[in-house]
Amino acid sequence: MFDAKAFLADVPHLPGVYRMYDAKNTIIYVGKAKDLKKRLSSYFRSQLASKKTEALVANIHHIETTITHSETEALLLEHNYIKENQPKYNVLLRDDKSYPYILLTKHQHPRITSFRGSKKVAGEYFGPYPNAGAVRETLNLLQKLFPIRQCEDSYYKNRSRPCLQYQIGRCLAPCVEGYYSQAEYDNQVNLVRLFLQGKDGQVVEHLVQKMENAAQELDFEAAARFRDQIQSVRAVQEKQFVSNERLDDLDIISIAYQHGIACVHILFVRHGKVLGNRSYFPKVPNNTDLSELADTFVGQFYLQMNQHRTIPNQIIIDQSLSEVTALANVLSEQAGHKVSIADKNIRGDKSRYLALAKTNAEAALTLQLKQDTHIRQRYDSLKALLNLAEIKRMECFDISHTMGNQTVASCVVFDKNGPLKSDYRRFNIEGITGGDDYAAMEQALLKLYDRNLEEEKIPDIIFIDGGKGQLNRALETFTSLNVSWDKRKPLLVGVAKGVERKAGLETLLISKWDKEIHLPPDSPALHLIQHIRDESHNHAITGHRKKRQKAFTESGLESIAGVGAKRRQALLKYLGGMQGVKAATLEEIQSVPGISKQLAEVIFDTLQHS
């Protein structure tokens, strides 16, 4: 039993971070404090603040502390520990994806494109946008308003004539000389920059001046082009909310919390424009109060993933934060500019946006609660069907290939809350006869299970997408395993599609019962199985398509001896891309600079037989 009195005797009155461990030496909670002794002493009073704290203290085996120079340093260290260890009793932000941006590259003829990840590519970044769909929508709009290129560099460098985008007025064709000047292209790039910075008025003023100049020079075709561009920009302005006050860069956060489930909704405003919104559902330990949730979420959201996220000038939230000043100081240091946090007395247009965020948070939470109810119903139905007391982990396998080529196996994982995408796996299947799905399934199962597994990674159910043959092969594979964990624990279930391969007509083959089950189409258990099976199928197909595309590309030029990067580029440039190379005659290939007659014959023969 943990001796709190002896431990507290040696804890100093200094700022720092503490880590609480259970009997398995697993970190179950991470916290910080201005005064470690006072904070840690509060856990061992006779009357504790909440049931959550009681449960936490009951599981403490030992505590470690780290003294820091300041509360600010403690705040950073705390969130690093939380991100690394994902403690059971901390509020955890489950979303760990980087956010997409719009990138304006630093080329002679800049390209505008979407970008996600660390900002290593030279250029100007605009965002972040809440999702890839918002970026695509903005890029489509920009292409209609400003005709600058969005194509890949490899495509741009190998053009000998303008592409379709030029023909329909969506690009100035900078890839080919003689169509537009560098100055004209630079002008459109500058308009894109102004538009993305929220300076729509300057864009219109600039275009009006250009239109008037063209009219004075009697270049009525150019004047008409500028007129159409002005009308398009103004049409966009009319659809967007125009604020009476300058909003600049800010995030507006509202939290809705019911029945142990929280929704944090964020509106992203950049350069005075709302780029979009997004809802988050952090993992919240039982009996967590709202103030702790607000403090922890804001810290995690901006500190744990700051390398991929732009920290705005201001953060507005509808919950009081206990450490506003300390958090603002840390964020300012991380962002390289002053960051203010407002958690009260919000007025003007900002209050309108905060109300909008609150409405969205409550609506998203209501929907999530309904979905959770449906998920629980499906799980309860499946437990009853299979006569299982509990289902902690389910895995499902599927095989995908084209005529036996580029075979890929997938494994998806579900728990009682739905998909565990961080545990999804794909396996490249090699060394088997093409189209042998049984051998492919065996190889996938061996790759995943023929090794030591932690107790929590052992599935309760393994679904095999296939009939009796696939299931029997899976059973044989499990029998052959020589592992330390209990290989008899997983229940293997085959999911056969039926004669007409229609959803709702599946047959379940239960390994331990040696019997088939036909469920009615409205069965909640069947709906859960279909969801898992479809997720596995989609995961396998996605992996297979990537592998097939890679094989298709490499079957062209990369695999031919004597064709390096320069010759490959010359072939693509002179023959009009890969399709042109494949359609070219021997004489046409030989006419490409740097390609000898002998090499042309090798290229021609390889492509004809690939």
UniProtKB/Swiss-Prot annotation:
GO CC, alphabetical: cytoplasm; excinuclease repair complex
A GO biological-process term: SOS response
Functional note: The UvrABC repair system catalyzes the recognition and processing of DNA lesions. UvrC both incises the 5' and 3' sides of the lesion. The N-terminal half is responsible for the 3' incision and the C-terminal half is responsible for the 5' incision.
Annotated ranges, domain UVR: 201-236
Stated family: Belongs to the UvrC family.
Keyword Cytoplasm annotated: yes
Protein origin, superkingdom: Bacteria
PANTHER family: UVRABC SYSTEM PROTEIN C, UVRC/OXIDOREDUCTASE
Self-association state and partner proteins as the record states: Interacts with UvrB in an incision complex.
Protein name: UvrABC system protein C
Coarse class of the protein's main subcellular location: cytoplasm
Domain GIY-YIG, first and last residues per copy: 13-91
